[in-house]
UniProtKB/Swiss-Prot annotation:
GO terms for cellular component: mitochondrial [4Fe-4S] assembly complex; mitochondrial matrix; mitochondrion
Compartment(s) of residence: Mitochondrion matrix
Function in brief: Involved in the assembly of mitochondrial and cytoplasmic iron-sulfur proteins. Probably involved in the binding of an intermediate of Fe/S cluster assembly.
Taxonomic source organism: Schizosaccharomyces pombe (strain 972 / ATCC 24843)
Family: Belongs to the HesB/IscA family.
Keywords: Iron, Metal-binding, Mitochondrion
Lineage: Eukaryota, Fungi, Dikarya, Ascomycota, Taphrinomycotina
Keyword match Mitochondrion: yes
Tagged with keyword Iron: yes
Biological process, per Gene Ontology: [4Fe-4S] cluster assembly; iron-sulfur cluster assembly
Gene this protein is translated from: isa2
Positions of Fe cation binding: C131, C196, C198
Name of the protein in its database record: Iron-sulfur assembly protein 2
Amino acid sequence: MLMKSRVNLLFKGPFFFRERCFQTLLNPVIAIRQLSHGSLRNSRSCRIDAKSNTLTKEIFPKINNEFKIKNRFYSSKLANDQFTLQEQCDEKGIPFILYVKDSAKKQLEKIAERKPEENSVLRVTVDGGGCHGYQVSFRMDNKIGNADTVFVRGKARVVADNISLPLISGSEIEYTNELIGSSFQLLNNPRAKTSCGCNVSFDVE
């Protein structure tokens, strides 16, 4: 009876399932994901507040099969050890995603080992310009904002803001070694209609 009263109190109003994840990142964070109940749509975004640097997981209990949680499907391109913090979704409730490939992961982990005190993340930004209308740039950063989505794989962390991410969601982040030099690159952007040969500039539908 006590359990039933507690559940009624927790889930008063629109039913929802809440998962709280605490992940050690550049800044201490708390990630809260709200999933729909019944015909309610999935929450479009997940906010992070800096309060703790300890990773735990709390899930409200499933009672009488009342809460049906749909498993999200990601492409097989997603590595098993990659996950997302401060997740953002499109208008259909589909999460935006960047695939951190092995080459990018290894290079970012090397950078993290050389300068662990800097807590650097790789920031991907899309600006207007270039020969095709939009251009992609990469830089190392040591700040994560409320509008950023963080893609974590091992010690590698890739960040994109809520303006850039919708234009490149589904792309792969690689680190390439070429005769002209080594660099991070954004490849196989499904949102791009055309792109330049150097994978820096693109246009969209």
